């Protein structure tokens, strides 16, 4: 039975922190599905389509190099429901610090109650990417700062283009 993992997030934008988690997650599964959460009440910087393209461009080569099947999807319901919908038994969550752990443990507990067959796997972020958040990246880019140390080159280009107009 293939090990299918779901890695959910907003990916607005994709950061080197996300890339770090994906590079570790592909070693744990046969198929990785990155799921972009779409929330009607939120106004993301990048459209759903732009985020799908970013995720595919940045993560697919990493998965291919690890001989891990890769897919990208969107969801607008509970994350655990999205995991069940795609047949995932592993939910990948990246952790930067203790604050992330406290929050993610609560979510993992609730998810376990709703879907005991979906197991949360925490992947600690590498030291070099721990301070990176998509929110900070957006703020730096919006103010004209250089985000190249925090995001893949394709994403840096997309951010520069987005804020140039």
Swiss-Prot record:
Residues involved in substrate binding: 10, 42, 79, 93
Pathway noted in the entry: Cofactor biosynthesis; coenzyme A biosynthesis; CoA from (R)-pantothenate: step 4/5
Keyword GTP-binding: no
Enzyme Commission number(s): 2.7.7.3
Reactions that this protein is recorded to catalyse: (R)-4'-phosphopantetheine + ATP + H(+) = 3'-dephospho-CoA + diphosphate
Binding site for ATP: 10-11, 18, 94-96, 104, 129-135
Entry GO MF terms: ATP binding; pantetheine-phosphate adenylyltransferase activity
Pfam families found in the cross-reference section: CTP_transf_like
Keyword hit for Transferase: yes
Localization of this protein: Cytoplasm
Matching InterPro entries: Cyt_trans-like, PPAT, Rossmann-like_a/b/a_fold
Principal place of residence: cytoplasm
Site feature (Transition state stabilizer) residues: 18
GO biological process: coenzyme A biosynthetic process
Cofactor: Mg(2+)
One cellular component term from this protein's GO annotations in UniProt: cytoplasm
Quaternary structure and partners: Homohexamer.
Family as reported in the entry's similarity comment: Belongs to the bacterial CoaD family.
Cited function: Reversibly transfers an adenylyl group from ATP to 4'-phosphopantetheine, yielding dephospho-CoA (dPCoA) and pyrophosphate.
Name listed for the protein in its UniProt record: Phosphopantetheine adenylyltransferase
């Amino acid at each position: 039975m293939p090990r299918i993992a779901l890695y959910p997030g907003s990916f607005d934008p994709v950061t080197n922190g996300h890339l770090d988690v994906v590079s570790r997650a592909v070693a744990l599964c046969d198929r990785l599905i990155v799921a972009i959460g779409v929330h009607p009440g939120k106004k993301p910087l990048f459209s759903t389509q732009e985020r799908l393209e970013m995720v595919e461009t940045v993560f697919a080569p990493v998965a291919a190099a690890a001989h891990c099947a890769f897919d990208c999807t969107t969801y607008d319901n509970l994350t655990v429901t999205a995991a069940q919908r795609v047949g995932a038994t592993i939910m990948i969550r990246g952790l930067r610090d203790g604050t992330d752990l406290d929050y993610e443990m609560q979510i993992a507990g609730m998810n376990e109650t709703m879907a005991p067959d979906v197991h949360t796997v925490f992947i600690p972020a590498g030291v070099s990417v721990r301070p990176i958040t998509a929110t900070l990246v957006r703020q730096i880019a919006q103010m004209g700062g250089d985000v190249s140390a925090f995001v893949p080159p394709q994403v840096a280009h997309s951010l520069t283009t987005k804020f140039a107009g």
